[in-house]
Amino acid sequence: MGAPLRHCLLVAAALSLGCGVAAADPGYVANVIPCEQRTLVLSAFPAEADAVLAHTALDANPVVVADRRRYYLGSISGKKVIVAMTGIGLVNATNTTETAFARFTCASSIAIAAVMFSGVAGGAGRTSIGDVAIPARWTLDNGATFRGVDPGMLATAQTLSVVLDNINTLGNPVCLCRNVPVVRLNHLGRQPQLFVGGDGSSSDKNNGQAFPCIPNGGSVFAANPVVHPIAHLAIPVTFSRRRDPG
């Protein structure tokens, strides 16, 4: 029998951002800076970020560093994104998000139009191991108050039809060793489901402190994605046999 499965599910929350437009003098002509709108996609720890980056086509110069945090520019299914790893906990998530908003403004030609968080978490109620949940609203105070996610993004999620894997396999999805046989670790024995709607909950387990990363902390506690996104770029490699002089 395989190793015990951890009770986890994938959760995603999205928050739309409004844009204000100020009236200008019709006779005034200004230099308009193109402002590309992107979605900020956040994950807490390396295993989560690696999963997102495995589906991200990176830009030619993908890495932006701000306040010692790395942001990765690219596209997911043709949609422009900024991918970032926050670190564990709400304080780290807040700091990473605030840094992103300070760095990516129209003055830099890239702005954030929406925020989405993707990661693993404990499940309750109708969810089971391996299920994917996209809540319609979120609470940070154990249900005292709720805040709804973006209606448009939630409506898009409600149109999704996906088939989820029920087998956990060994190996990293972005490993270059494509010819290595797949090793099956666990079989759920059921078909995981996608749930759109309902409630999601987050809470601060670190007493208002930023949870520290750990050097060489692996896929959970490290400071950056385990598989560095630069490795996703196509780099030509030539192998040749050494020839003895003769």
UniProtKB/Swiss-Prot annotation:
Transport among keywords: no
Gene Ontology cellular-component annotations: plasma membrane
SUPFAM superfamilies registered for this protein in UniProt: Purine and uridine phosphorylases
N-terminal signal peptide: 1-24
GO-annotated molecular function: catalytic activity
Pfam families, per database record: PNP_UDP_1
Topology within the bilayer: Multi-pass membrane protein
Chief location bin: membrane
Keywords (A to Z) from UniProt: Cell membrane, Membrane, Signal, Transmembrane, Transmembrane helix
GO BP terms in the entry: nucleoside metabolic process
Bilayer-crossing regions: 71-91, 104-124
Domain of life, per lineage: Bacteria
Keyword Signal belongs to the record: yes
Gene3D superfamilies reported for this sequence: Nucleoside phosphorylase domain (3.40.50.1580)
Protein name per Swiss-Prot or TrEMBL: Uncharacterized protein MT2350
Native organism taxonomy: Bacteria, Bacillati, Actinomycetota, Actinomycetes, Mycobacteriales
